[in-house]
């Protein structure tokens, strides 16, 4: 029988994130610190708007690109937060989560064999999306000594005449790294000089703890070269509503909308009405959640310091990325033993690329109470490993 599976699909490996949670779900008294999902409920006023839209019978398709009201609020939000002006008619597309936006942006822009530069460690979807778009993914291995930021030198050294697109995943999952304005200005200079485009994944833009997030699209000469990706899952605790958006040059958004039209039709109508409310009246909710995340972040950093576990200070998202190289085992081995012996699930850094070897992703999108119990178990485990090394 003929093989029914496409080669490029068979080439893609399943996400390394899920492995440990299939185990932990069956384990009594286990704690998971691995899922990148807010532990907060969607704020009630946002839920109410979704409920109200259902009660009013707003259950039909929207336009392919999304509700006019939502696209206008997205433009207002980006103008208010980043000082960027977009035309809601031609430069905004509402998608089923930020993940869909990443996928269709690559498919709309990349010709077979063109290169997509992907800094790693980073979100697991970028490389598979590039492969499915018939692109050649080129990995830029970020360094711990640079706090996992992308440098202009690393970018310049990687660009070839086949390079079309740079993925810029900051604030970063899994490291929590951010790019400050000066970093972005140096990157932008290379982008313009080399005449390539940027896919800027800014899904964690509201979750920064060292000043306001800066979008590369806000820098001179960059809006016309940037596809800005964002959404509602992380900032507004709306993961299950599955809603994101892309903003960028009209000719790119037009082609993305074409793919979206044939594959999806439109994003969920109920979710779109709820998102309008989130953008209009959700600032205080975001502030409260960000304050709670920051408290947890500080707790973890202090705990790592006390147990002598090396970890650079992350200023974005809701992850820490401690180094476990001192123990002489791989990230996967450490995570496996930690789960088996202490019943705590974390994610090996290698789930996010080879440069994540020797690190773990720990999410603090969990209650402080859970974090305290988990850190107690981590300290016990670390002390056990150090005792083993002395024998």
Where are the regions a protein language model picked out?
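Glycine-rich loop-to-alpha-helix module at the N-terminal edge of alpha/beta enzyme cores
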Residues: 20, 49, 57-60, 73-80
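PLP-dependent class I/II
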Residues: 2-5, 10-13, 23-27, 31, ...
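Short beta-strand to alpha-helix junction loop
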Residues: 65-66
């Amino acid at each position: 029988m003929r093989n029914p599976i496409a080669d490029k699909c068979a080439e893609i490996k399943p996400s390394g994130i899920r492995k440990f949670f299939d185990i932990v779900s069956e384990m009594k008294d286990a704690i998971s610190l691995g899922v990148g999902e807010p532990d907060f409920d969607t704020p009630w006023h946002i839920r109410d708007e979704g409920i109200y839209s259902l009660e009013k019978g707003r259950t039909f398709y929207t336009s392919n690109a999304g509700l006019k009201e939502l696209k206008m609020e997205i433009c207002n939000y980006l103008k208010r937060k980043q000082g960027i002006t977009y035309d809601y008619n031609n430069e905004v597309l509402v998608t089923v989560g930020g993940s869909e936006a990443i996928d269709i942006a690559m498919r709309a822009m990349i010709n077979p064999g063109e290169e997509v530069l992907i800094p790693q460690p980073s979100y697991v979807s970028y490389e598979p999306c590039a492969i499915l778009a018939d692109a050649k993914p080129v990995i830029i291995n970020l360094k711990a000594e640079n706090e996992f930021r992308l440098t202009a030198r690393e970018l310049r050294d990687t660009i070839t005449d086949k390079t079309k697109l740079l993925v810029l995943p900051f604030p970063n999952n899994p490291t929590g790294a951010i790019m400050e304005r000066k970093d972005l200005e140096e990157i932008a200079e290379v982008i313009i000089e080399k005449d390539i485009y940027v896919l800027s994944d800014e899904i964690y833009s509201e979750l920064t703890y060292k000043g306001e997030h800066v979008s590369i699209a806000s820098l001179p000469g960059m809006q016309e070269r940037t596809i800005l990706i964002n959404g509602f899952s992380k900032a507004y605790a709306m993961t299950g509503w599955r809603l994101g958006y892309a903003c960028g040059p009209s000719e790119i958004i037009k082609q993305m909308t074409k793919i979206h039209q044939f594959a999806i039709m439109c994003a969920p109508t109920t979710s779109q009405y709820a998102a309008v409310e989130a953008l209009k009246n959700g600032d205080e909710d975001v502030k409260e959640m960000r304050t709670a995340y920051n408290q947890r972040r500080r707790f973890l950093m202090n705990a790592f310091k006390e147990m002598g576990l090396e970890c650079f200070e992350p200023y974005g998202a809701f992850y820490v990325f401690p180094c476990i190289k001192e123990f002489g085992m791989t990230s996967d081995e450490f995570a496996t033993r930690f789960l088996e012996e202490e019943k705590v699930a974390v994610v090996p850094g290698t789930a996010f690329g080879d440069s994540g070897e020797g690190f773990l992703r720990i999410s603090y999108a969990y209650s402080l109470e859970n974090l305290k119990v988990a850190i107690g178990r981590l300290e016990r485990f670390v002390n056990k490993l150090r005792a083993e090394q002395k024998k």
